[in-house]
Amino acid sequence: MGNIWLPRVGASWAPRPDITVRGGFGIYAYAWSLDNYGGNNTSYGMGAAKSASGNVSDQTNGITPITKLDGPGTIFGTSNPLPYVQPSTSAAPAAAYNGQAVGFVLYHVPVPKMMQWNFAVQKAFHTNYMVEMAYIGSHGSNLIFATDLNAIPANDLGPNDVADGYRPYPLFQNLTGSSNNGISNYNSLQASFTKRFTRGFSMSANYVWSHMLDDQDSSGWGNREGPQSWQIANDLAANYSNSNFDVRNAFKGYAVYTLPFGRGQAFLNHNALLDELVGGWQLSGTVIELSGQPYTVTTGQNTYQQDGSSFPNRNPGVSVKPTNRSARCAQGSFSGHCVNEWYNPAAFLEPANGTFGNVRRNSLYGPGINQVNLSGGKVFAMPGENDPVKLQIRIDATNAFNHASFGQPNGSLSGAAGVGQPYAPIQQQQITGTTVGGRAVQFGAKITF
């Protein structure tokens, strides 16, 4: 693999005692493992026992390939640096795979890297208050991307053509595996306000506006790629769009407040009984407000006979938001969208055979998250001869206001009358699940001694 150069640099400057300016840049790597490289595609990676046509099978428990694709009977021109052990059952040229779908694992795969940079300005006010503004960005390269090397080139297929004749390697069907040319980009503006704990109160709030784009996410196991939606396997740029993780707006905050009653506080501080009853109580809460994540609208009609997804065409002049909202919004409305019909399927048209739809990956956004959590508690001192015994009681309410945060709708379209016709409303556009559970209240008590 060789050495990996991962430089990192940072700087900080304080032009005044109450102002700090910081910045930094670094390159980080996702180290490869056997799971990422070989186990990524279990049917043909390292350790796989692959069988070819006829009486040819692996005799090495997946240590060496059954056949080399740069051998006789193929137009492949790749080289194989691994030692090659011929199976004992037959001399198997690559032609043993003719007419079949074949998997691949790349050699000399570069390590995925992530460049990150940031610039921030921090200002303190009256010792106990702090405001910070920051820009944070990143760029990922050499990311894993599941693809088909033998996809039919766009615009080559015409009426009455034989599809397999236009494949780059027509001796085979799909050539599926993972490439390493995926990229990602992230840019964000972040603002935060913090009050240190004084006079029984502290709080912090931060807001992030961000945009993340990529052509493949990494939500799979380890560093593997996650769920994929592409319709042009040999055109990675066509898949570059909003990331599955893109959350444009995010607000989070917390607060802690000690009630001003009892000993040492402003009120009811001279009565021992009142101090035990109302003194020392502490309340806290957190707020989470997130805008929705994107999803992809697909059609069940495979208009190009590929092994990816088929996207519809956009219907010009027709709103993506449901048109008959009054009849379908009985269970909730969010910014013009309805739980019973989150998007308008008539805004999309069935593409013609042999064409790709013009709707991009992750072009629509689902519901966001709204959650408030509240807690309260107090520590009681109990009489003890030696070490003090303390009783802590608390109550926690998760999603205290029982606000529903709905899941994503099903983006699969069906029911179009024909090519160029809009899709009909079906049950799949409804949202039937949630991402956050309902209100849960928990009481607890703990004795320490």
Residue positions per predicted region:
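Intrinsic N-terminal pre-sequences and regulatory tails
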Residues: 11, 21, 62, 68, ...
